[in-house]
Amino acid sequence: MEYRYSYVIDPSSYDNQGLCNGIPLRVHRNADIEEYATISLRNDWRKHVGPLPLTSYGGNLGPKYNFTAVTLPECRPDRLEIVSYIMEFAFLHDDLVDTAQVDEALALNDTWRDGITEGLDTTSAKGKKSGEGLILRNILKEVTAIDPVRAAELMKFWKRDLDVSRDRKHFRDFDDYMEYRIVDCASYFLIALSTFAMALTIPAEDKDEVFTLLTRPVWAAAALTNDVQSWEKEDKLFQKDNATDMTNGVWMLMKQYSIGVEEAKRRILGKAREHVAEFVKTLSQIHNRLDLSLDSRLFVEAMQYMISGNLMWGISTPRYHSDQSLDEMMVARMKYGWPNHREVTKLTSDLENRGTKRTHQDDTEGVQSVKRFNGASTKNGINGTNGINGLNGINGSNGVKIKRHKNKEYSGALTKDSDLVLNMDLNGLSSAIICAPADYIGSLPSKGIRDNVADALSIWLDVPAKELNQIKRAINLLHNASLMLDDVQDGSVLRRAQPTTHTVFGPAQTINSAGHQIIQAMNEIRKLGSDDCLDIFSEELEKLYVGQSHDLYWVYNDSCSPTIEDYFKMVDYKTGGLFNMLARLMTAKSSSSSSPDLTALVGLLGRYFQIRDDYMNLTSADYTVEKGFCEDLDEGKFSITLLHALSAAPEPEALLLRNLMSGRRNDGKLSVVQKNLALSIIEGARSLEYTAAVLQKLYKAIVRELESTERQFGENKPFRFLLSLLKV
């Protein structure tokens, strides 16, 4: 997985109690968004429903980690606010159900389930139900506006989760309890919320295995860990209500085996560790599961943070631990809203002077409605059709658009505040602006070919997982940078069926972001700690630029068409360069005693990939949807198909074709009629047949090279499967 929105926490800085060994802890870079959304939901609850449930202290928030930020660290930034808002809503619902009597709890579930199914009619609902219904309807409206397809899936799974009978207290034994608990821990809800948060599409044929089998250990481990962490809270409620049974694994083992609390906890945590170890094994194998879609594999990988994130949030959350408290800034934000810059400075100073300490009572007091946050107005905690408006400048359905602040208090601030003028210790600039174009193109659907190639080559090279991920991230950063630059240089308007980056952010910002991506790629390579890897990166990157220069030169000087040999040299540098860089870097970091020479294999693959792309551009209906009808003709690209047509067509047709390609300069593109004329000349010269024959020849050569390598280093099923996907 390419991590774009989160950073990893140094494992030496926290104690995971052996409950997530082999799984890192990551935190979303925009964790403040979750805090804002959580406080907004709690304000909306007070306004529309009434006082918060007595057990609702903390919710998403924690003194060290916020729940969504660590369980969904790769949530898209433009969806983090609504996802966090939903998560807090679910926490409050759980609190209501936990403290309600059986009949009332079932009624609450029915209210929510009906609201999700039909959309609550708030004019007929009363009291508490009406308020919850209003918030729920706003949530449904918001997620549907952002992503209607995944929103429908979210609602379906959320309803499925609520269908679980929440009043069940009696189980045959611990195993019977676990079958119930895996669903009761909101696995259906969290599965769907995760796919929505990361904009993943899981094919129907993958769902049973991915949702039910592969990730089952995740929900088992999370449920058991939660049972231990929440024991004190649940036991207090149990004793307060004079109950005779409770839904908790610790209690189940105590009853079944007549053991004490501490022994039951010890056994529960032991079982949790077993489930974690099982899932770590799944993670080690998932990259080779090319029978699953890329999104399915990404989903499975992302679910590891449901284990580590849930654990580390749960260790310190005030929700479970009454001796824990939120930090002072969270206290202030809950009590006073989100002040502007000057108010933050004053408030922080006041808090430091008073030594304010967080108490449970602070959270149950009324909180002022949040009116402004960094210059953005809010309503029901959410503003903007597709996500965040004004928070760190993020706004938009498919990317990030920076909004200028309109707070009049800033006018003349520099001239009024001499201390600020002379202050050389200002906070650094946010990278949100420069990363926005790259984040946008990274969010578009991708086949993940380069990741698949890396996973396949690792069968032979056995690159350690950490270093393999760093190499893959560097390659993906370079690939996305090249796509942004290519689209600017070619004047493309579509990329993967969406507007190209420069048509959203403008050429200047796009070029700047692409350069930043290249620097980030270099930083990833530097982390490998190898001078050889830096040399490989530099050498292959230079080839990429040289190859692109020839392609651009031929387009600009369209009378100077290249030879077939020149074309192949360009492809080897431009397209083959990334594949070659990938193979060389992986070879340099291989832990195998001997490594294959992959030069010919990846070189042939690079040629095949480029020629296939050119061929599909002229013949594939899918490419027409993703990039436009025969877009290469608009760009004036000299593909092998066009070069053959110019040399094989009768002179009058060849001259006509050349004039069409030159004439595209007038409007920057060809009309549909002109493209059809060009296609008729290309087809008349049998250039498409020629291209198909070249592809077939290359494919056979790749297979021969693969078989030769397999004879020395073993069978490589993932590479064969990848080839079958690319075969024309």
Curated annotation (Swiss-Prot):
MF GO annotations: geranylgeranyl diphosphate synthase activity; lyase activity; metal ion binding
Ligand binding (Mg(2+) 2): 94, 98
Binding site for Mg(2+) 1: 94, 98
Binding site for Mg(2+) 4: 486, 490
SUPFAM superfamilies per UniProt: Terpenoid synthases (SSF48576)
Binding positions for substrate per the UniProt entry: 94, 98, 181-184, 226, 230-234, 319-320
Record keywords: Isoprene biosynthesis, Lyase, Magnesium, Metal-binding, Multifunctional enzyme, Repeat, Transferase
Chain positions covered by the region annotation Disordered: 352-379
Motif (DDXXD 2): 486-490
Motif (NSE/DTE): 226-234
Positions bound to isopentenyl diphosphate: 447, 450, 479, 496
Regions of compositional bias (Basic and acidic residues) in chain numbering: 352-363
Biological process, per Gene Ontology: alcohol biosynthetic process; mycotoxin biosynthetic process; terpenoid biosynthetic process
Entry remark concerning the domains of this protein: The conserved DDXXD motifs as well as the NSE/DTE motif are important for the catalytic activity, presumably through binding to Mg(2+).
Oligomer and partners: Hexamer.
Function as written in the Swiss-Prot or TrEMBL entry: Bifunctional terpene synthase; part of the gene cluster that mediates the biosynthesis of the diterpene methyl phomopsenonate. At first, the universal precursor of diterpene, geranylgeranyl diphosphate (GGPP) is provided and is cyclized by the unusual bifunctional terpene synthase PaPS to give phomopsene. The C-terminal prenyltransferase domain of PaPS catalyzes formation of GGPP, whereas the N-terminal terpene cyclase domain catalyzes the cyclization of GGPP to phomopsene.
Protein name as annotated: Phomopsene synthase
